[in-house]
């Protein structure tokens, strides 16, 4: 079998950098250890909100949405403390721009607006939930320097909770309190249908989900074991953006016919917001920085180096893609043969590979970043996508991925179709 090689490397001159050597990422919970007044690892609550969660005040769902207040007209005012570093300003500005370019939420810098967020260097990574009125603080310390963490805290300030606190989380996670300190047990409480509502499916790749070992070894265990290393990802998922849009009732007067589960962009109604791995006005094209591969009825091999030409660690991901196509209605199969130069970690937040094989093109598929997890190597992945995107992410140096791929005659159309239960988009299951 002939292995075709390729290289996707970026010379690092525009990316935000966090240091010259690999630095252990500290999640929101770890950064806030010892900080008073924190619930759920990184959330600050007003006294009224605490009474709601503690059950000392009873409210209807309509009243609850008033407790977790939205920003009027989806416009958020903010300012930076003088000590807020230039790197953090760039990172936070990038996070706000990402949200505003894919939703109807807009951000405006102002230190005199009646309601505003104050960004401060100190106190770990934490935020209040929703708009509290007046000035509220968003803490963004030195352990927060990753793009998805910036978005994570902003999403709290927009009124969104953690994925692992959803009232239906027990369908997707097993929660162990064995190694959780007694004073931390409250961080693992679920919300109720009376305090929150779910607008999207449970998303293992959400930037609002903590990792497997956040509160202690094996505290949050995925009931789908394929997702164990995906939990804690800080890339920002498509469904994270959908969550914001639903929260703020974003939309356009006229909807486009977006493909592959995309939606009309409330920030620019002439184009669609596309799931990761898809691009173009209507989400029917490959993203830039994509290598296109054509599957045959026999196994073909391919390897690719992707990432940076330097070992500096960045605060955001360099994304590159493979796009595997086959004749219409054929089923594509992929095998990951080797992962070289990957950093094994929960959340795969240094580098990772995602084969988008599931029927719902919007959901995050399991990420792979651990060469020692040999049970996932040389295993046939049967895709319900044609073309099948493979997403490669990198924050530190470069990595090498080797795959085999082919198509088989099993018609995709022989699969049943369903929805995610939250909207009407149909896909193969």
From Swiss-Prot:
Glycosylated residues, chain numbering: 54
Enzyme Commission number(s) from the entry: 3.4.24.-
The keyword Disulfide bond appears for this protein: yes
Entry's Gene Ontology BP terms: molting cycle, collagen and cuticulin-based cuticle; proteolysis
Active site: 153
EC category name: hydrolase
Domain EGF-like: residue ranges: 245-284
Domain Peptidase M12A, chain residue ranges per copy: 62-251
GO MF annotation list: metalloendopeptidase activity; zinc ion binding
PROSITE patterns noted in UniProt: ASTACIN, EGF_1, EGF_2, ZINC_PROTEASE
Stored InterPro entries: Astacin-like_dom (IPR034035), MetalloPept_cat_dom_sf (IPR024079), Metallopeptidase_nem (IPR017050), Peptidase_M12A (IPR001506), Peptidase_Metallo (IPR006026)
Major site of localization recorded for this protein: secreted
Paired cysteines (S-S): 104-250, 125-144, 252-272, 274-283
Alphabetical list of Pfam families matching this protein: Astacin
Cofactor notes: Binds 1 zinc ion per subunit.
SMART domains (alphabetical): ZnMc
Signal peptide segment: 1-21
A GO cellular-component term linked to this record: extracellular region
Residues where Zn(2+) binds: 152, 156, 162
Domain of life: Eukaryota
Subcellular localization, as worded in the UniProt entry: Secreted
The protein's role, per its UniProt record: Metalloprotease.
Protein name per the record: Zinc metalloproteinase nas-17
Organism, as annotated: Caenorhabditis elegans
Taxonomic classification: Eukaryota, Metazoa, Ecdysozoa, Nematoda, Chromadorea
GN (gene name): nas-17
